[in-house]
Amino acid sequence: MDYQLLERKAQRRKRISRIVLYVLLTLWGIIVLFPFYWMVLTSLKSYGAYNAEYIPALYTLSPTLKNYVDAFTQVPLGQYLLNTLIFTVITTALMIFVITLAAFAFARLEFRGKNVVFTLFLSLMMIPNELVVITNFTTITNLDLRNTFLGLILPSVTSVFYIYLLKENFEQVPNELYYAAKVDATSDLKYLFKVLIPICRPTIITIIILKVIECWNSYVWPHLITDNEKYYLVSNGIQEIRENGFGRENIPAMMAAVVVISVPLILLFLIFRKKIMAGVSRGGTKG
């Protein structure tokens, strides 16, 4: 038997498989990245050049930044970005505080009816979001919190899914650490902040990033609860650009605003992508 021939055939098959894999990954990458490329390209085209194209061009020979100037001057986009930042930071901080305490209670504390209460919590995930939005809107309106940051923030300060995810991570920490801490007269809160949170930091960071993305991209709730420009978020800004006339006509300027809004989230993901993967991996591992 010619082992060298067999080895060459195996290497050839491996090389062909690798080429096919790279081609498929390249095609998938193009499909994923093309919408963002098109958005950036359109934002760099002048109004006249964009409307003169009968067939949209995949490049531009005369890029311009005027659309970005229009995005900030036609509407107070800077103020909307600041409002979104305030909403995102406060909401995320409050949610992390709430879900951390709730997850710790379900994971480590013993109290009557714990399993029943947790089951009821999980059952809330079965309720359609549309019903929750209606209930939240009615409640916030009755409390006279429309057009306030408090009205924007309150419905988003907890998440059953994140409580469940963090509880599962807390339960992966050996019980011996908890018992040893109790022997040393360590309080539950001190054990939580000194032991559990540092160990489960990757998952907590992942939750923070996912919540930041969720808040930054909020669309339905801000439109329902605010009709005062003082409390508009970036999603309201995009809608305002379209409604005030130039957004419908001047697509390049609207794309420029979308690029500005998207860049912070893209940078956030690129910076913390390893921690996100670590948190997801830990969340899917038992023991």
Where in this protein do the model-derived segments appear?
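A hydrophobic, multi-pass inner-membrane permease signature
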Residues: 2-287
